[in-house]
Design a protein with these regions (language model features):
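An amphipathic, aromatic/His-enriched active-site/gating alpha helix that lines ligand/cofactor pockets
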Residues: 33-39, 58-92
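Short, surface-exposed ligand-recognition loops at beta-strand->loop->(often short) alpha-helix junctions
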Residues: 12-18
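Glycine-rich beta-strand-turn "strand-cap" elements at beta-sheet edges
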Residues: 1-5, 43-49, 77-99
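Short, glycine- and small/hydrophobic-rich beta-strand elements in well-ordered beta-sheets
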Residues: 29-52
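Active-site-flanking beta-strand signature of metal-NTP-handling nucleotidyl enzymes
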Residues: 5-11
Length: 99
């Protein structure tokens, strides 16, 4: 059984905070991809609305995700989400469909 954790996170930047949020998210990619247990952590921008960013994430297990959520840069983005985003961060967990 695959114990990997798949996540999708959506951030909608306040227009006046877009560049600040984008810079913070890019920094998170650089730091997170070095974490033990991070399988992938990809940042995308919506092709129709450049204020919307998405993370596609995969974690080796719950322990790796728990560690990630306690890092200073994740705690900082969670603390600042109401200032930087419209509607906060939308996070979905997914199960991979094997074909």
């Amino acid at each position: 059984m695959d114990q990997k954790i798949y996540m999708f996170a959506r951030f909608r930047a306040k227009p006046e905070k877009r560049e600040v949020l984008f810079s913070r998210l890019q920094e998170m990619v650089l730091l997170t991809n070095k974490e033990t247990g991070c399988v992938f952590y990809h940042l995308h921008v919506d092709s129709q609305n450049r204020d919307i960013f998405y993370f596609m994430e995969c974690w080796q297990n719950q322990e790796a995700l728990d560690f990630h959520m306690q890092t200073p840069y994740i705690q900082a983005i969670l603390r600042d989400e109401s200032d930087l985003t419209i509607g906060g961060i939308d996070i979905s967990f997914m199960d991979r469909v094997e074909i």
